[in-house]
């Protein structure tokens, strides 16, 4: 048993992005640090919303420019998969509301450094359904408010239909890290844990517990 400070940066393995989509090396050649600075410190419309000091602090908090190249690659691939899923969920032509919501969510996920997390969750939920034959719940908790999660089939509830708020799940002012509550059938839970351990390595998989005290 090890203790872990919630103030520490998240420890996550890398989701395997196909090389023909892009690599960290190709992104280093394609994008400058100024490109990344502008992309990660502005809003989804490209407007400046942070002071220079706040922007520099944000870059540092995300892990510096080397880390930003990885986050951008993951964010671009997440966008690619999300729009594929959006057309499967909503049809060939998306409404303005659907596109605006998707772009807003993707921008928040990117600028908070979480695209890789969503890719990994998508991966093991897909494996549970398609490879392991494990029943997966439709989604619950605040993650059910994410249209991106719906498009990736992490959840099966359309937040737009039920007026669910994404900000309850993830927003820049939220202190705690996001988590996606996922229900697996009892007899399949260990199958999913074993699959994740094999693919991402046992050192990247752990059971966690939180104790409350008065």
Task: Indicate where each model-derived feature is located.
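Phosphodiester-processing cores and adjacent nucleic acid-binding clamps
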Residues: 1-214
């Amino acid at each position: 048993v090890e203790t872990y400070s919630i103030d520490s940066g998240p420890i996550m393995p890398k989701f395997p992005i196909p090389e023909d989509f892009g690599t960290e090396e190709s992104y280093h050649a394609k994008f400058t640090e100024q490109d990344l600075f502008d992309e990660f410190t502005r809003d989804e419309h490209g407007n400046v919303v942070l002071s220079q000091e706040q922007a520099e602090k944000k870059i540092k908090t995300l892990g510096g420019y080397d880390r930003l190249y990885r986050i951008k690659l993951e964010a671009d691939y997440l966008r690619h998969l999300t729009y594929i899923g959006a057309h499967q969920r909503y049809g060939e032509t998306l409404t303005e509301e659907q596109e605006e919501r998707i772009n807003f969510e993707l921008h928040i996920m990117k600028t908070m450094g979480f695209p890789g997390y969503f890719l990994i969750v998508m991966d093991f939920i897909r494996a549970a359904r398609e490879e392991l034959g494990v029943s997966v719940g439709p989604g619950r908790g605040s993650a059910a408010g994410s249209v991106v999660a719906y498009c990736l089939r992490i959840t099966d509830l359309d937040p737009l239909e039920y007026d669910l708020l994404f900000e309850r799940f993830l927003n820049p002012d939220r202190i705690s890290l996001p988590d996606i509550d996922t229900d697996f059938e009892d007899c399949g839970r260990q199958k999913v844990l074993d699959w994740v351990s094999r693919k991402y390595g046992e050192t990247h998989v752990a059971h966690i517990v939180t104790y409350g005290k008065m």
